């Protein structure tokens, strides 16, 4: 909605701008809190992705944010509880366009588009599968490998969680096959584990100072809710039409994760800390909070609420498979 791309110069920097529209949990402004730290965070992540063997092998890419700017409103900044949206109306983030990282035979596809259907109610994912020449299960397995494995590895080894909803994930596609993932948005959509991980030592202090830190049992929901619930949950019903039942969908995901973990036995303690196979997962909700959060008068963004836990589909299909 608010990212502008250079139409005349392919590969030029995108610019992200504030937009006074209430979408999901907040008005989409540019907070000044992360402006100075954003470029430092993206440079650190790019270094990690360029030197970590697993991430290099995955081909995953961090879309850098080389610069950002923000101007505060003197009047609203002086008020203790001024609505936050009035303090986030003048800012900009420059971000690398995915085309900068694509190979000549690749094309960029937002993962959110995999939830879409055409006018005949045919899933777009099905068109990519047909073009790939792969069967649906093989195609899904490849999708999980290039998207979920890098996200989970970043979390377990470095204690860094990215809220990887469908707009933050770009797939590099080649003849309908997902090749690798391009990740973006580190100003507010990146969080750190509360525990001290030595792999995080090189993260600039300026980034640490403005980045939220959560215990492992809450940080894991950035992957479970941020990706499994908000993205995969909407793709899986479409895959049923293509011959992949929902349980089989999650069996394939579980198999990809299990294969990754078997290849990294030295990280077993981290896998236990960030377990994706517990019987239940946190249920994070936004819509009910919208009805009660004093957004018009408050100076802060809405916080999610937690309801009764949900059964974990990865645990369910693993139990069925083992039995």
Segment roles from a protein language model:
Residues 1-146, 173-323:
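Nucleotide/phosphate-binding site architecture used for ATP/NTP-dependent chemistry
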